Structure formats: C-alpha cells, structure tokens
Swiss-Prot record:
Its main location: membrane. Disulfide bonds: none annotated. One of its GO terms (cellular component) is plasma membrane. It is found in: Cell membrane. It is a multi-pass membrane protein. Keywords: Cell membrane, Membrane, Transmembrane, Transmembrane helix. It comes from the Bacteria. This is UPF0391 membrane protein Bxeno_A1464. Belongs to the UPF0391 family. The chain crosses the membrane at residues 5-25, 30-50. HAMAP family: UPF0391 (MF_01361). Pfam families: DUF1328 (PF07043).
Amino acid sequence: MLRYAAIFFIIAIIAAVFGFGGIAAGATEIAKVLFFIFVVIFLVTLLMGVMRR
C-alpha cells in the first residue's frame, strides 16, 4: 500500500510541474485533437459493427 502511495505521489508531482508550467496549454490542444480523432474512430468502428450484423 505504501508503494502505491509513493507512485501516486510521484505522478502528482509530475502533473504539478506540467500544470504550473507552460506545458499545460500545449497539452490541452493536443488532447482536444486526439479526443475528436478517437471519437471519429469510435463512430466508424461502431457503424462497421452494426453493418456487419
């Protein structure tokens, strides 16, 4: 359990460095683009699955 706490602490420190630095603004733009790409991929695979039946 202490191992998981240490891992989450390290992840929180890394997230804080990115959040309080200037990297977060660029990362949000990349995340928005990736979100829409994966939504399109999801819809295409969903339609292919429906058509297959």
